[in-house]
Amino acid sequence: MAIVLGAKERKDKKHSTLRRIRSQGGIPAVLYGKKVDNKMISISAADLEKALREGGRHSLVTLKVDGEDYSVLLREVQRDPLRGELLHADFQAVDMSAEVDVDVEVRLVGEAPGVKDGGVLQQNLHELSIRVLPANIPPAIEVDISGLQVGDVITVGDVQTGGTFEINHEPSEVIATILPPQQEEEIHSGEQQEPGQPEAEEGRETTPEG
């Protein structure tokens, strides 16, 4: 999906200017890159939120700054910790012929037989760092779990890249596994305590009276 964002260059970073930008529905941002002069810009907060929803956090973006186009990656987003509103964004201009390192969502697909048998699906990695040409950045890396039985694991080495990217992880790193069903005694650990009997404090032994 092609993502296009419009932006305007701003000339200063005074607090009054930043407040005015935010009051008008925008956010301040910066554009930087090896072959690009650093620019202070402003963009529509609503447009960036839409781009994040539709394309994800690490998609390639065409950023139009006062009529000039840049191929960029969104490298950092700052939000208000209480309201969650966008506050600032950093865009990195990229060379379309040079590989970049990006983090991409891991999306588990399929239904694992082990889960149907009572096992518990545990996902250890929710993102993978990959090295890829900007035009080939996938929206997500799908990992098929439809063959997993209880006790089975899927590792980084099992991921099919199609030759379009390299994964910056050890092949032995676990992406997902099916844990055995919990036994009843594990769920209700320890015997039920008799009424009136005080609990033993952790790290101390209790001795019978008398």
From Swiss-Prot:
| CDD domains in alphabetical order | Ribosomal_L25_TL5_CTC
Which Pfam families does the record cross-reference, listed alphabetically?
Ribosomal_L25p (PF01386), Ribosomal_TL5_C (PF14693)
GO biological process terms, semicolon-separated: translation
* InterPro entries registered for this protein in UniProt: Rbsml_bL25/Gln-tRNA_synth_N, Ribosomal_bL25/Gln-tRNA_synth, Ribosomal_bL25_b-dom, Ribosomal_bL25_C, Ribosomal_bL25_long, Ribosomal_L25_dom, Ribosomal_uL5_bac-type
Query: Which portions of the sequence form the region Disordered?
Result: 179-210
What keywords would UniProt list here?
A: Ribonucleoprotein, Ribosomal protein, RNA-binding, rRNA-binding
A GO CC term attached to the entry? cytosolic large ribosomal subunit
Q: Where is the composition biased (Basic and acidic residues)?
A: 201-210
What GO molecular function annotations does the UniProt record carry, in alphabetical order? Answer: 5S rRNA binding; structural constituent of ribosome
Q: What does the subunit section of this Swiss-Prot or TrEMBL entry state?
A: Part of the 50S ribosomal subunit; part of the 5S rRNA/L5/L18/L25 subcomplex. Contacts the 5S rRNA. Binds to the 5S rRNA independently of L5 and L18.
Task: List the HAMAP family hit by this protein, alphabetically.
Answer: Ribosomal_bL25_CTC
User: What is the role of the protein in this entry?
Assistant: This is one of the proteins that binds to the 5S RNA in the ribosome where it forms part of the central protuberance.
Give the family per the record: Belongs to the bacterial ribosomal protein bL25 family. CTC subfamily.
> Can you say what this protein is called?
Large ribosomal subunit protein bL25
**Gene source species:** Geobacillus thermodenitrificans (strain NG80-2)
Which gene underlies this protein?
rplY
